Amino acid sequence: YHSAKLKFYIGDVRDARSIEQAMRGVDYVFHAAALKQVPSCEFHPMQAVRTNVLGTENVLEAAIGAGVKRVVCLSTDKAVYPINAMGISKAMMEKVMVAASRNLEGTHTVICGTRYGNVMASRGSVIPLFVQQVFAGQPITITDPAMTRFMMTLADAVDLVLYAFEHGRNGDIFVQKAPAATIETLAHAVTGLMGKPEHPVQVIGTRHGEKLYEALLSREEMACAEDMGDYFRVPADSRDLNYGKYVDQGQQRLTQTAHGEDYNSHNTQRLDVAGMRQLLLKLEGMQRLARGEVVDVEEG
């Protein structure tokens, strides 16, 4: 792909110098580089740290040094209550981002982030796998029929990033309100769209590091989140390291969480098969599949 507006570099977020070179003359940065495959990160956790944590530090330091106006870091629902190496590394990525945002006095750089769930048909996601299995005449394999995941289109994910770009302040994390579905519902929606509603589904059990459901906001974050309509904004904790004052000063919001709840894929809007099918039809590849074409549905 050729465009006068694009310039490509060979580099790596692990290589600070290559990032510094790419950052020259840049106004805005969208940091999406990551190791995101949960099982791979379970077996190679330090590789996740080097890319997701130290790589983020390299990006932010280079952006600040180059005088970049705005940086948006992309995170994941797996960073909330993390139980796997990928989620832990992305939670640390968020902490690195928020910490960097606290030290920007005298600069023109704003650093904020987004957190979202499953982007349907993205690279490495389950929908392209389901489609391949149907075409191959193999049973669709699911880990746990009751497992729920947030469902977002690629367009939704882009909208979230642009919203953060336009409205973010230093240390903010933005979450888009999204529906969810069980993996079983998703499988039946895919087979129905492909004209094979009776295609067999096989339960194989969970993979390394998987959760039954995902959360986009913890209870503690929900207590301080600002509802912005289609989005939540979680501001950075503005307190400093002067712990002496905490002897007689607390934080009221943390006492409000005892009877609250997090925002997760079990308590958000739940899609049935018909609703999931309608959401799938927002994807061009799934529209073509519904017309009987043989296509690659993977997006991004």
Could you tell me what each predicted segment is?
Residues Y9, A34, S75-T76, R115-Y116, ...:
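A secondary-structure boundary/capping signal
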Residues H2-Y28:
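Conserved Rossmann-fold cofactor-binding substructure of NAD(P)-dependent oxidoreductases
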Residues V59, G65, K95, A99-G300:
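Strand-loop microenvironment adjacent to phosphate/nucleotide-handling motifs in alpha/beta enzyme folds
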Residues H31, L35-A91, K95, A99:
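Conserved Rossmann-fold NAD(P)-dependent oxidoreductase catalytic core, especially the SDR/UDP-sugar
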Residues S18, Y28, L54, S125, ...:
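Residue-level recognition of oxygen-bearing side chains
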Residues F8, A48, I111-T114:
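Hydrophobic/aromatic anchor residues within beta-strands of the central parallel beta-sheet
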Residues R14, A79, V119-A121:
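Conserved sequence/active-site signature of Rossmann-fold short-chain dehydrogenase/reductase
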Residues M23, F43-M46, M86-S89, I127-L129, ...:
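Short, glycine/charged-enriched secondary-structure capping and boundary segments
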